[in-house]
A protein has these predicted regions:
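Intrinsic disorder/low-complexity signal
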Residues: 1-20, 192-194, 199-202, 208-209, ...
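Nucleotide-state-sensitive switch-loop elements of NTP-binding domains
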Residues: 3-24, 33-36, 40-117, 123-127, ...
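Conserved beta-strand segments of the P-loop GTPase G domain that flank and frequently precede/overlap
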Residues: 23-24, 53, 117-120, 147-154, ...
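The conserved Walker
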Residues: 27
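Conserved glycine(s) of the Walker
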Residues: 30
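Conserved catalytic-core segment of NTP-binding enzymes
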Residues: 125-226, 231-232
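Conserved GTPase G-domain signal focused on the G5
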Residues: 247-258
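Conserved small/polar residues in nucleotide/adenosyl-binding loops
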Residues: 265-271
Length: 272
């Protein structure tokens, strides 16, 4: 590791550094696809987005990663050296990356771009519930970081599946302490009626409550409704924004959220 860096000198605390957007969600929610599509979309608008891969278990990515954790951590080597299975190796790999957090921050902030978008590990718990992630966020600059949480569209079609994702998103926001906005990933896969229903659930709590009672009822529903009401009181970014990596719907919303959420004054949407 490089020496001579005190917390006061960390690049992440320099407000001239670009914002860092962590893309978080359950396995298969479309995190890598979003990073790929957002990078392509931003280049078309001549807005440079720096793509970062923090998933050591990714077999391949389709975006141009300016930093790829697989260049410094080999999951296979970790498994062999420490006699671990895939899950244990993923956890240890996250800790090994965190141990090099200052070097990672130096490398990222030496790059020229207007936004850093980070593809996190496939399993949400590997990013959200490890101290290594909190340390990495702190080094990169907590005041300049935010989270995009992706809802899986298939799971969102049922009231209980939708509420489960709302709860998980809130837990991630609470755990990492970053501004968080929810996006409905792969919205192009849904029928128009399904999409409208899900968006209505996200905007009108009373409609979601009725749907929960129709689906199940009982104590489980009462518990979910109580949690939802509490979440509604404290939510900083209510609602759900449709997002599609195929049609590029919602990409401008991602950029606008980044602009509004972090201490960075030079990031703007193109006017033409």
């Amino acid at each position: 590791m490089k020496g001579g860096l005190s917390p006061q000198n960390m690049v992440g605390l320099d407000t001239s550094s670009p914002p860092v957007i962590f893309v978080v969600g359950t396995a298969g929610a479309g995190k890598s696809s979003l990073v790929t599509s957002f990078q392509r979309w931003s280049r078309f608008l001549e807005t440079e987005a720096i793509a970062v891969n923090l998933d050591p278990g990714a077999e391949r990515v389709h975006y141009d990663a300016e930093f790829d954790v697989r260049d410094i951590i080999s999951l296979t080597e970790v498994m062999n050296e420490y006699d671990l299975g895939p899950n244990g190796a993923q956890i240890l790999a996250a800790d090994l990356v965190a141990a090099q957090a200052l070097d990672v921050a130096d490398e990222l902030h030496a790059l020229s771009g207007e936004l850093i978008i980070v593809d996190t590990p496939g399993q949400v718990e590997l990013f959200a519930f490890r101290e290594a992630s909190s340390h990495l966020i702190e080094v990169l600059g907590q005041d300049q970081a935010a989270i995009i949480y992706l809802f899986d569209p298939m799971l969102s079609r049922s009231p209980s599946g939708f509420v489960s994702q709302m709860l998980l998103s809130s837990i991630v926001e609470f755990r990492l302490g970053l501004p968080t906005k929810n996006f409905l990933s792969k919205s192009d896969l849904l029928e128009e009626e399904e999409l409208e229903k899900i968006l209505e659930w996200s905007e009108r709590l009373e409609i979601l409550e009725l749907a929960l009672y129709d689906e199940a009822g009982g104590q489980r529903t009462e518990f979910a409704i109580n949690q939802l009401r509490m979440m509604q009181q404290f939510s900083q970014s209510p609602g759900l924004t449709p997002l599609s990596s195929e049609t590029e719907d919602g990409m401008a919303d991602v950029l606008t959220f980044a602009q509004a959420s972090v201490s960075y004054t030079h990031l703007t949407l193109p006017t033409n």
